Amino acid sequence: MLLALAQWLQGDASFLRLFTYLTFRAVMATITALGIGLVCGPWVIRKLTEMKVGQAVRKDGPQTHLVKSGTPTMGGVLILIGIAVATLLWGDLTNRFIWIVMLVTFGFGVIGWVDDYRKVVYKDPRGMSSREKYFWQSVIGLFAAVYLAFSVSEANNVRVFDLFMAWVRSGLSMGLPARADLMLPFLKSISYPLGVWGFIALTYFVIVGASNAVNLTDGLDGLVIMPVVLVGASLGVFAYVMGSAVYSKYLLFPHIPGAGELLIFCSAMGGAGLAFLWYNTHPAQVFMGDVGALALGGALGTVAVIVRQEIVLFIMGGIFVAETLSVMLQVTWFKYTKKRYGEGRRIFKMAPLHHHFELSGWKETQVVVRFWIITLMLCLFGLSTLKLR
């Protein structure tokens, strides 16, 4: 919004050229989202408390968690407000990637909000059924996947439509330009052509998978938000490189026109996340709930797809991957042993993984900070793929 205003008034005030610089707008988006979160946080927490949207705590979990019962949840709305305002103020609203990421983020946010609302207001511990939640995630994820399949390699929506029609005329058999290939880290001249169907399948898996992985990780005070901020910031760096014809050529990456604008979104997400951490750090005054976790995970997955860094997201988001695998392994092994031996057996003391470490004697803050440190190291490793190729 401010970019368009600056471009309109630029002839009358040369200093407004500052608003055309992507890095300046990224910094301002961070500050804006951070400020909104810090200022509006107490009001949002107070309103959530008045609504009696307290978090229910598992009685079979760590006993130290029982004191968390009743802490306001659905605090993810605070993050989404910060992201929305900062992105709309400082982003280029003609950029198609901004809108598709916003669609996924807020679409998944609505799913999470409905789930949270049913749990805490209607006192239904099940919330949305797994089938219902997965259905709506799939609708949004598939829509984004189909659109991105034809837009990642093209400069504007006219060319996106032309590419789509060419695919239809080919009998749905035509491939995609090389810029839509799956990039392999550390290999500068080797990529894997996915084709349209492969791209759609991978994108769907990344977006929906990332959303649910972040949601599973959200179980301790401050645990999930800092990894989201770190991974989001790292993806913002990739977006800046991919969106720049100069830097992408120098680093031997495919140039993706318009991708650089995602730095604004990632910066807004970082600022909003840090503001939320102010109130979510131990002992938490508010939890983000599904409304925040599903939305942020979907956002990370979508940005990773656009900048063609799905594998790097898997690396940098290693904590999310480990948490998800711990649940899958625990459930699978329990069902298998129950069927074979008549009693269910566990691999971990409790899943997701962070609860296993708690029950192993780690304090909550130790688990959280150590997971942050691991994520920081993984993000630095992921960023190293920019040059080590």
UniProtKB/Swiss-Prot annotation:
This protein's encoding gene: mraY
Organism encoding this protein: Burkholderia multivorans (strain ATCC 17616 / 249)
Protein name: Phospho-N-acetylmuramoyl-pentapeptide-transferase
PROSITE patterns in the record: MRAY_1, MRAY_2
Subcellular location(s) per record: Cell inner membrane
Function summary: Catalyzes the initial step of the lipid cycle reactions in the biosynthesis of the cell wall peptidoglycan: transfers peptidoglycan precursor phospho-MurNAc-pentapeptide from UDP-MurNAc-pentapeptide onto the lipid carrier undecaprenyl phosphate, yielding undecaprenyl-pyrophosphoryl-MurNAc-pentapeptide, known as lipid I.
Coiled-coil region: none
Membrane topology: Multi-pass membrane protein
Cofactor(s) the record lists: Mg(2+)
